[in-house]
Structures are given as structure tokens and as C-alpha cells.
Amino acid sequence: MADPSKYRPAPGSIPTDPGVYKFRDENRRVIYVGKAKNLRARLSNYFQDITQLHPRTRQMVLTAASVEWTVVASEVEALQLEYTWIKRFDPRFNVMYRDDKTYPMLAVSVGESIPRAFFYRGPRRKGVRYFGPYSHAWAVRESLDLLTRIFPMRTCAKGVFNRHERLGRPCLLGYIGKCDAPCIGRVSPEEHRETVNQLISFMNGNTAPVRKRVTQRMEEAAENLEFELAARLRDDLGAIDKLMEQQAVVLPDGTDADLIAFSSDELEAAVQIFHVRTGRIRGQRGWVVERSGDQATTDVVEEGQADPGLPALIQNFLIQFYSDAVERQRQEAAEDAKLERRGVDQESHAEPRQGNAIPREILVQALPEEAEEVKIVLEELRGAQIDVRVPQRGDKRALLETVERNAKEQLKQHKLKRVGDLTARSAALQELQEALGMDSAPLRIECTDISHIQGTDVVASLVVFEDGLPRKSDYRRYRIKEAAGDGRSNDVGSIAEVTRRRFKHHHDDKRAVPDEELENTTFAEEMVREEAASQTKRSSYPPQLFIVDGGAPQVAAAQAVFDELGIVDVTLIGLAKRLEEVWVPGDDEPVILPRNSQALFLLQHLRDEAHRVAISYHRQQRSKRMRSSVLDAVPGLGPQRRTDLVKHFGSVKKLKEASVEEIAEVKGFGPKLAQTVFDHLHAS
């Protein structure tokens, strides 16, 4: 690791102008590119107290061996140069939104002499037009099946095409009319390309001419009594309608917009983008990236809270995504020009693609950090005005919320995929063992969290993970009694109370029946023993690792309880607001886990689960308290009689004004119960 003080620029040598900077490692490779309104202010942050830096930023600064910068005239130029350098150097510490290789697409090989349509996953290739991406592989295949009803074109691979060309007879699709069989000369290459052009035009949204043409042919066939042909054309219309249903109208006709939403935590961020063209969703894409640099946050992002790093995430994404899109569009235009020079009019019926890469509207959750500068850069790329904004109401707001839900689901599925990976779970437990100096991997981990609002309804959760997976049957919930009440709350005391209640019978729970005693146990005695064990199952397995919510004070409180109870065989740690900081009893400094480690991901999962259970229980208790009534404590008064009383008098206030005789008139109430209710209501 390099020493940042050795390459720190001399005081006063960094300009205060806007610019772009590069960190290089000892081999002169660029490892991070950033931009700044004020280079001196930004770069100085990297050379302050290194322990205060975000872990990934700290790793970058320690990996670097030098820093250099370039001054530019404006913040807009800084944005453009930053993107150029990121593309050129591919720095390891920058967030890169690369094409998602997992999404299936419909591809058309326009560069071939006899183009074909096919299902495709992978990086984009020259001479191929792509449509999608689609959410599922079956959606591509279904679309391709419907498209070949209307546009019978080649879908086979080169080997299949060559074989049937040699045989002189078409494949099955050629016989059933889903391919125009250019392999045997049924149509010329020019006629086949005309069919391909019509398909591309249709997929670009130009559906009306195709529908009109098929409808006209169907009516003509019916007039000429060609009912079999008319029926087939009717089915073709049905296929067109089904294809259009897959791109349902979600916004007014003529609306061209991209809707972008993020879902993030302190480690990763998922982004989803919906492409809406002429009011229909034409495509959807998604990525999950590790947060770093300006987009990283060190604090826990609570559910429902605004992510402070969101504007930086959005800004980085907009510049990268649309710059890449325009560059790709230019490459496709250059390929089209080459084909045209060869005398191939491969898109005479297609919609013009100029300007399609960046729509007129870009709808986001929050404006980017430097909204005006980003807008200028995007307008230069598009060559026309654009509107980057946050929709506040109506259909656009509703659709953006749908995009956000997709992003949340994507992040959730990404986490579940990691949780379900046995190798990743094993690595996480091994990393925890090494980081905490444990004798063995913590196969059973328990984590507690406190939840309350201004000292009311203070509760705690205790979640249990075994082999890295939740064991929900062992979860426990506590109402804090000693450390809270009357609107007061003591988080440190609450942690101590939960720890004491959890481990009060720790030594008793560990006792087992000796083997020699078991040998002389009858079947009946064994059944009684098993039944008793099942009733105390929740506490019968002590954890190897116990995690408390909080930093050094909370850990010290839990350790005091451990000392009081004589517990020495359970490792204790605390998770502070900075997730990667793991506090160990007696240590002045926290243990720092690598940000991309499986151990940190497991701790995040534990903390989130404990937080979820605590919040849920707190809401339940708060709701129960708000529904409670002064009648709940009246002895002998059940739910039905309480309801009858309130229904009879209209409210508790009017009930208090009633006499014993009036209460006794209510059905089911005698003089004795009426007197009890009256005395209870007027006891104060």
C-alpha cells in the first residue's frame, strides 16, 4: 500500500478552477477519475484523516501512487472530459454501467447478405440490429414466432441455411409459411431484404401501415371468396394485436421519454430504465453496481429515507448511459452508410434513428447534482432541447413509481441470489471467523435491534441465522420494560436488558444429558424429555456470535451483562451506523471489513432483518396502544360488551356522563356490572 503523504500535492499548488483529476497506481495505470467545481477543495478531501474516508475511497487512496489534474473552462467541459477519460482508461474504482449481458434481445443480422432474425444474449456486435431487451427469454421467442407470421423471413443459423441450400428444399418453417425460403430461391435476396426492412420498421413503432396493408388484403380475399387466405390474414391481424399488447400504451400518444429509478443501500445500487416511445414501453434495462467514489455513502440508508448519494448516482448514470448510447448510434449509422455504399438499401422503410438515443424527456427520482451542466451536455449529445425533471403527479409519476418498484425488486433478487449461494455463505462465515479471531466459523449468529419513536412503545428484535440463512422459527421479540417507559428511552440500557433476558439461562440451556445417563432412559422418559426440550427450543442453542445494534457504548453494555452472567464462549460485536465498522469489546478502534467482502454482505443482511422485525413489532405495539380504550381494564367486560356500551351511548365521553341505572339498561348488563363500569370510569 502506498503512503498518501508521499504523493500529496504541495500546499497551494492545486488550482481552485473546475477540472478533472486522475489517480494512478505505481504502474502508472489510471485507477480513478473524478471531476470537481473546485479542484483544490475536492482533492484536499482525499488527503485529510484517512480513517474518515469511505472504505472504498480509502482503498483507492492507499492504492494510488500519484495524482494529476487538468483544468477546464467550465463544469460542462469537466463532465465531458470525465466521461471521456472513464471510457478511455476504464478505472477500477469508478462505477461503470456496462451493457447487461443477461437480458435477452431480438436481433436482426442486417449486415448479412441474407439477414436473419434470432434470439440473442451478449455484447452488441457490428452489423446486427437489436430490439429489446426483454424481461424473459420466452418473450423474445413468442415475439419472433408472431413476427414470422407477418414477416416470413429467415431465422436459421448459417449451417442450417447452407444445408438446405445444398439439399434444394426448405425447412419446416418454409413449408408452413413462416419463412420465405431464400435458401432455395423462392424469393430473391432483394425481396427478402424488403421483408426484413418491413420487420425493422414495425419494431421501430411504425405499425399502422402494416396493419392497414394486412386488413386490406384480408378484405380483398374475402371479396374474392378466398376464405382460407382471409382466415390466415385474420390470424395475422391477431398476431399484430398481440405484439402491440406487449407494448401497452402507458402515456399519451407522441410521448417519448426515458424513466430512470434507483434502489440502493450503503453497499450497492440497482437502476432500472424504461424506454417509452410514442406512449408505449419499447424497452427495459437494469443494472446492479457497487457504490464507490462520489456515489458512495458511509451511513445506513433507512427504508423511506432519502439517499444522500442519489443525485450523484443519477448524474453519473445519465452522462455514462447517454454518451454510450449516442456513440453506439453513430457506429450503427456508420455501418448503415457502408452497406449503402455497397448498394444495399437496408432501411428504406425504417424510422429515422437520429435523435432516438436520447428522448425529449428524461424523468428521474431526483435531479442530478449539477442539473444545468448535465442538461447542457445531454442537449449537445442530442442536438436538441431536452427536459430532465422529477414528475410530481399524474401518469408519469405513477409510471416512475413502477420503475422504482422494479429497481427495488431487482436489488432484492440480487441479494437473494447471493444469500442462496452456498459458496458465498461459506466464504462469509470464514471471513467473519478470521476478522474476529474466532476459533471456529459462527454457524449460529444472533442479532438484536431496538425500535421506538421518542421513547414510546420501545421494543427489540432478536433474529437468528444458521449457516448464513435466517431461521425464523427462532426469532424473538421483546417489549423493553426496565430501560424505557413514560416517554423515555435508553438505547444502551435497552441493549443491556435484551442481552440479559436472552442469556439469563445461558448456562442451563447448554447442559445436556450425559451419554451414560441416556443409555438407561426409557422410551417414555425420552419422549417427556424431548417434549420439554421442544418447549425451550428457542433458547437451547447458544450462538457463536452475538451482534448488537450500535457502536462502542452498546457493545460495552452487552459485555457488562456477559461479565455479570459469566459468559465467555460467545463472541460479541456491535454494528455502528457505518456498516463496515465492527466494534469489538475493549477495542478503541473498530474492525474494518472490506466493502466488497461476503462477510460484510452477511452482516448487512442480518442487520436489515433485525431492523425489519423490530420496526414491524414496534408498529404493531403502537397500533395496539392507539386502539386501546379506558374500558379495556374493566374486570368482567369482554370485547362484545365493550362494543355494545360504546354503540349504545355513542362515545366513551357520553358513557362517563351516564348513571349506574342508565348503564344497567344496556342489554347484558346487570346492576353489579353496571356499578363496576361506573366505578372504574370515575375512579380518578
From Swiss-Prot:
GO terms for biological process: nucleotide-excision repair; SOS response. InterPro entries: GIY-YIG_endonuc, GIY-YIG_endonuc_sf, GIY-YIG_UvrC_Cho, Hlx-hairpin-Hlx_DNA-bd_motif, RuvA_2-like, UVR_dom, UVR_dom_sf, UvrABC_protein_C. Residues 208-243 form the UVR domain. Residues 16-95 form the GIY-YIG domain. It is found in: Cytoplasm. GO terms for cellular component: cytoplasm; excinuclease repair complex. Residues 332-352 have a biased composition (Basic and acidic residues). Keywords: Cytoplasm, DNA damage, DNA excision, DNA repair, Excision nuclease, SOS response. Its main location: cytoplasm. Residues 332-357 are annotated as: Disordered. PROSITE patterns: GIY_YIG, UVR, UVRC. It holds the Pfam family UvrC_RNaseH. GO terms for molecular function: DNA binding; excinuclease ABC activity. The UvrABC repair system catalyzes the recognition and processing of DNA lesions. UvrC both incises the 5' and 3' sides of the lesion. The N-terminal half is responsible for the 3' incision and the C-terminal half is responsible for the 5' incision. Interacts with UvrB in an incision complex. Belongs to the UvrC family. This is UvrABC system protein C. It comes from Corynebacterium aurimucosum (strain ATCC 700975 / DSM 44827 / CIP 107346 / CN-1) (Corynebacterium nigricans). The lineage of its organism: Bacteria, Bacillati, Actinomycetota, Actinomycetes, Mycobacteriales.
